């Protein structure tokens, strides 16, 4: 299972927290289960949860699968302007908040990812959150 740090807008985090959002869409995703620490951007600016992702789907496959539903195809085509993949959100866990200031203070060279960073070869953020 890959470990990564994913960045989220507060509105997206809120939808995951509420159980409304069941897929996470990105331009690139590895084709394997992911445990992601959730960094929430301004105004929160903190790691606030962990999300488990699995079962990567290509949006182009969904376009073919739902080709008889014009509304679904239109939504999929809109998503394809920005994303290639969707992964199922299989689990969510809220954690204690770790502020950006604390992360920068305690982890030399810490930078918030624009989309995501792998933590497999960088155990410091992982050990910080446990």
Regions inferred by a protein language model and the residue ranges of each:
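Short, compact, well-ordered microdomains
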Residues: 95-115
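Short beta-strand-centered aromatic/proline hotspots
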Residues: 48-54
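Short coil-to-beta transition motif at edge beta-strands of beta-rich domains
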Residues: 30-38
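Catalytic phosphate/metal-binding cores of nucleic-acid and nucleotide-processing enzymes, i.e., regions
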Residues: 43
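Conserved small/polar residues in nucleotide/adenosyl-binding loops
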Residues: 129-130
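Short, solvent-exposed secondary-structure boundary/capping segments
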Residues: 59-69
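Residue-level recognition of beta-strand microenvironments
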Residues: 54-56, 92
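Long, hydrophobic N-terminal alpha-helical segment
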Residues: 1-31
């Amino acid at each position: 299972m890959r470990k990564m740090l994913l960045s989220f807008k507060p509105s997206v985090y809120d939808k995951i927290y509420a159980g409304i959002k069941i897929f996470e869409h990105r331009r690139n995703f590895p084709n394997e289960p992911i445990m992601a620490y959730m960094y929430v951007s301004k105004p929160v600016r903190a790691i606030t949860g962990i999300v488990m992702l699995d079962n990567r789907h290509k949006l182009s496959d969904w376009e073919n699968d739902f080709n008889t539903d014009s509304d679904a195809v239109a939504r999929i085509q809109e998503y394809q302007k920005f994303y290639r993949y969707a992964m199922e959100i299989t689990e969510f866990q809220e954690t204690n908040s770790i502020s950006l200031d604390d992360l920068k203070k305690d982890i030399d060279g810490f930078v918030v990812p624009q989309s995501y960073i792998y933590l497999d070869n960088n155990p410091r953020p992982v050990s910080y959150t446990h």
